[in-house]
UniProtKB/Swiss-Prot annotation:
Gene name tied to this protein: VQ8
Motif VQ: chain residues: 62-71
Protein name: VQ motif-containing protein 8, chloroplastic
Pfam families the UniProt entry points to: VQ
Segments for region (Disordered): 1-42, 80-108
Subcellular location: Plastid, Chloroplast
Keywords: Chloroplast, Plastid, Transit peptide
Organism per entry: Arabidopsis thaliana
Covalent S-S links between cysteines: none
Transit peptide: 1-58
């Protein structure tokens, strides 16, 4: 049965195509010739539909602000908006004025600060570190005391 297949493959072929005399080859123009492109991808161009907003908030209101802007549940959003002091402003032509007011160190401001680490501790940093980690603020008025971990 194999010879029959060979005969079919090696059988007669159709005649080759012939081109008309007025035909010519088409050459595609390269976009690289018109302007040189740097290697890699071109950086994206950001076009804003609206001017970006500058949001001013206190450190203790930051989490509530992020949750409000990212779509927290309406009931929780109403409760946090009563105590939030975040201000949304639009700043146009902001200069490089570095004369910011110094951080207020009065007693009311210090009471709002908490003694929490600004990193997520792993078990290694929690039990392998000689430093103390405070998880509750000592400025709280309730009967709880701060929880302190100290490795010896």
């Amino acid at each position: 049965m194999i010879p029959t297949r060979c005969n079919e493959i090696n059988g007669s072929r159709p005649s080759s195509l012939k081109l008309a005399g007025e035909s010519h080859t088409i050459k595609k123009t390269s976009s690289c010739k018109s302007k040189p492109r740097p290697h890699g991808r071109a950086s994206p161009v950001i076009i804003y539909a609206h001017s970006p907003k500058v949001i001013h908030t206190r450190a203790e209101d930051f989490m509530a602000l992020v949750q409000r802007l990212t779509g927290l549940d309406e009931i929780i959003r109403r409760n946090t908006s009563e105590s939030s002091s975040s201000v949304v402003t639009e700043e146009v032509n902001v200069g490089d004025d570095n004369t910011a007011a110094p951080f207020s160190q009065d007693r009311t401001q210090r009471q709002k600060l908490t003694d929490m680490p600004l990193f997520t501790p792993s078990s290694m940093t929690l039990f392998g570190s000689p430093t103390q980690l405070m998880y509750m603020s000592p400025n709280r008025t309730d009967s709880f005391r701060p929880l302190v971990f100290k490795s010896e």
